[in-house]
Amino acid sequence: MITNNVRVPHISKRCGIASSRSFNEKWVPRPFDFVRRTGGRRQSWIVGVLFAFFVISLFVTGTSAQKNPFTTSNPSWVQPLPPFKIAGNLYYVGSQDLAAYLIVTPQGNILINSNLESSPPQIRQAIESLGFKYADTKILLISHGHFDHCAGSAQIKRETHAKYEVMAEDVPVVESGGRNDFHYADRKSFWFPQTKVDRVLHDGHTVSLGGTTLTAHLTAGHTKGTTTWTLDEQDNGRTLHVVIVGSPNVNPGYKLVNNKTYPQIAADYRHQFEVLNKLPCDIFLGAHGGYFDLSQKLLLKSGQKNPFIDPVGYKAYIAERQQAFESELKKQSAERH
């Protein structure tokens, strides 16, 4: 999801809109004090120059995500969050608001979402701090083809050799690095590294590894290939239905009426809500922490009940997003008359 009114870490209920708080500034390297002497100090000077270049490179890499206006206004997208177990073999390895999920199996692991171009080191650290191997990532999936969920895919695929599996309607977007997006194609700040897809998915396709099976549900609208993932988890003898919502949100500037680059956008949104309303849900998750009140649920995690088991919250969130869509559609339709 890309939205210009999401500010976390304190997330308001259900809609993913949040209040802004202070953000710890990143460390900025001090200007390097070059050694000016020659002779015996020449080697020190060379080493110093190389060190300065290395530090500056780290700084540039670390701030590359900030080139996009959405990342500067949403610091929670890059703020680390200690990884944790959700249930069974399902773990959270994302940031404070950009969700990424690791599914661990005896035959390797499945990662959902690569997030920003700057996110892979953070995701890797989260995976390894849980005691798992980053190199064991065998399959990489995404929620949808926006830069805040798939810009890190090229690096993760290169480093782990994971098989990249994407819904067919979003394949042209991820393989073009966002240049074929129906709304953001002409905005270079929304482009990301082009990544070759290894398997093209369609609605209802399954992804299986090591005894775990996920089902891909096409829930288009936010993008043409937005994907909601479902799987079952065993937790304390119970079978829990997990739903990872792709995105039901209408971004600022989206045309729901007479959209020349996406004529069926309104129909796709309506179909999405039909699908989401029918899915059985015990554990409610999504592409952004704001969807499922991540910050609030973490405060309850030490209790006896698993706060991520939230079927009521799921139904409320989907109903709210559906109402928001219908209101926006009605508004845009009225403006055309």
Give the location of each predicted region.
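Conserved beta-strand hairpin/beta-sheet module of binuclear metal-dependent hydrolase folds
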Residues: 75-130, 134, 228-250
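Metallo-beta-lactamase
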Residues: 67-71, 79-81, 85-87, 136, ...
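Active-site neighborhood of phospho(di)ester-bond hydrolases with catalytic His/Asp-centered motifs
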Residues: 112-114, 137-145, 164-167, 218-221, ...
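Accessory terminal helices/loops
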Residues: 50, 62-76, 236, 250-337
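Intrinsic disorder/low-complexity segments
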Residues: 1-66, 158
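Loop/turn elements at helix/coil->beta-strand transitions in domains of secreted/extracellular proteins
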Residues: 108, 136-138, 160-163, 212-214, ...
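Active-site HxH/HxHxD metal-binding segment of metal-dependent hydrolases
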Residues: 118-121, 128-206, 303, 309, ...
